[in-house]
Design a protein with these regions (language model features):
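Exported/periplasmic cell-wall-interacting domains
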Residues: 104-105, 119-219, 224-225, 231, ...
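Surface-exposed, secretory/extracytoplasmic low-complexity segments enriched in Ser/Thr/Asn/Gly/Pro
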Residues: 1-127, 132, 179-181, 186-192, ...
């Protein structure tokens, strides 16, 4: 059945369950192909049990359709988790879209469209080369941001990106090497998980300022939130061409 564009529940790495109501991730039946297949079966008098023709596929038919390999992005905490086959592979602070300029990264359930090494992200007034490019919502994607000294905290409010999720280079590399086109990206907001860090986290994992916070490695959960008790996923029911002009850096 169709699950694309339908609400999805996620037991987050913070122990709370959220409902993600937007985004195109999920199964989607190809109406034209399915109709043609059914007509053919009827004409031939055949009776069979078969899977529908899909124009878009998801990870699972049981429980939540996104399975146990996905990127979990908490836009409130500015922190993400990448689970591969149910195990936490990497987590990190990030910087999302600039809220003050109206470029906030949208919440929703999406999928990695493709991945590309050494892309150039282009938009009005900028052309930014990145080493690891993983778009998931049009021109919005995950990528390294080696021009940033810090990540996380409240940077995104006034110093955020054009909409993309900016990552420390080492984190972007790890995700890139272990993610595939079609893998889910689940973005959400969660009240109560706002980071207390005002300066963000440096590339090496130390705090940028002497604000009231301890230095937290980029592989640790935000201070105001509880990290997962284990590394298991939460229970859930060649250089290429430049990226098109609409890409957000």
């Amino acid at each position: 059945c169709n699950t694309a564009y339908k609400p999805k529940t996620l037991k987050t790495s913070y122990g709370k369950t959220v409902t993600i109501t937007t985004g195109n991730y999920g199964w989607k039946i190809d109406q034209a192909k399915e109709t043609a297949a059914l007509v053919s079966l009827i004409k031939n008098g055949e009776q069979t049990s078969r899977e529908p023709e899909y124009s878009q596929k998801a990870a699972s038919h049981s429980g939540n359709d996104y399975g146990n390999t996905y990127v979990e992005i908490n836009l409130t905490a500015q922190h993400l988790y990448f689970y591969a086959n149910g195990k936490l592979l990497v987590e990190s602070d990030f910087v999302s879209g600039n809220a003050a300029k109206g470029w906030s990264t949208p919440a929703g359930a999406y999928s990695i469209t493709y991945k590309q090494r050494n892309a150039t992200l282009k938009g009005q007034g900028y052309a930014t080369p990145v080493s690891y490019w993983m778009p998931f919502n049009g021109g919005i994607g995950l990528h390294d941001a080696n021009w940033r000294k810090t990540f996380g905290g409240t940077i995104y409010k006034n110093g955020g990106s054009h909409g993309c999720v900016n990552l420390p280079p080492a984190v972007a590399k790890t995700i890139y090497e272990n993610i595939s086109a079609g893998d889910p990206v689940l973005c959400y907001h969660l009240d109560g998980t706002e980071s207390s860090k005002t300066g963000g986290t440096k590339k090496d994992g130390t705090a940028e300022t002497t604000a009231a916070t301890t230095a937290v490695p980029t592989t640790a959960a935000p201070e105001t939130t509880a990290a997962p008790a284990t590394t298991a996923a939460p229970e859930t029911t060649a250089a290429g061409p430049s990226v098109p002009e609409t890409t957000a850096a």
